[in-house]
Amino acid sequence: MRHAFVFVISTVLASSAARAQAPRKTPGGERARVEREIQKLEEHRFQAMIGVDLKTLDRLLADDLSYTHSSGKVDTKATFLAALRSGELKYESIRTEDIKTRVYGNSAVVTGRGEIKVKSGNQELSFPIRFTDVYVKRDGRWVMVAWQSTRIAQQ
């Protein structure tokens, strides 16, 4: 009898410890809601980039943003917004597809493909990209902390 009691207690403690160490998962319905919320933020961000809506971008981008362009140039939030404000960088259109959003508690990773038309300095460019960006929830709201895009080779 004593061995059975020790076995039951050991099993309960082991399963409790395993549950405590398991990563927190967002319930299915909540995860889907957050994924939709992040996708809407992405749409607003792209529209704000095209429309040079600096107020919206200031709200959507984290102060510690790392924005890596497909050229390899890295901007901070301040330098990215300054380039848009000055007209040095002007997005003409941004079309996206194959968007996937994955939520991990207070973080979300977005991946996808895009077609970018942009004026950078005196150059007008149009090219396809693959991108990854990361959102985190801070002070009750989602902000983008990282963007990285890679040009897709034209075939």
What kind of region is each of these model predictions?
Residues 6-15:
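Bacterial N-terminal signal peptides
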Residues 19-60, 64-155:
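A beta-strand edge to alpha-helix "cap/lid" segment located at domain peripheries
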Residues 1-4:
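Positively charged n-region of N-terminal signal peptides that target proteins for export
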